[in-house]
């Protein structure tokens, strides 16, 4: 285990440099994520739902190929990660990026919300930003810290559960408002630098809010990424900073 506070990213126009408590190494969590991702792929392949929509897979791969090189703005090591991009055919409205760059999109998110390439890029940039900031590692560290306090008080009867952290945990992780704000900001910048219109962040979240209306159970993506008006307002406030990056990318600069 590692102890202490650090920041996982730096630089960028709207990046984040908040200090984070980390009590588990990146290598440990990345290995866990890689194993979980491999199991998810195997389970999905066995069900015949992995990468069956070749057109959508090609589309998602093309967008990822433009965004991944931009991650070096925030982390010099990130472009060299062992990136993976796959698509599960499912009506589920979800997408995520596990630690270390393991990306998964569900076809329902794109099909049911009729996402444009710009909107897909916003989703992808947001999810990648969670991985860049190592929000999952931070959450595990907070759980470890809480257990250590309970141990000192003699109140905890359970194990830490870190070893049992499976892909269901990575998929269903509910990040804090601070985490979500950081991912929104950095995701906008990543997509803009890759030549995708950051204004799509506004249309995307309006679509998300519409999808959540009249539903007794919110879509999977919204259960972990709540769509709120103030979230849209924050994105709108960032557009003057990231639009020049998009315009420069479109000019090929």
Regions found by a protein language model. Give the residues of each.
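A Zn2+-metalloprotease active-site environment signal
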Residues: 3-253
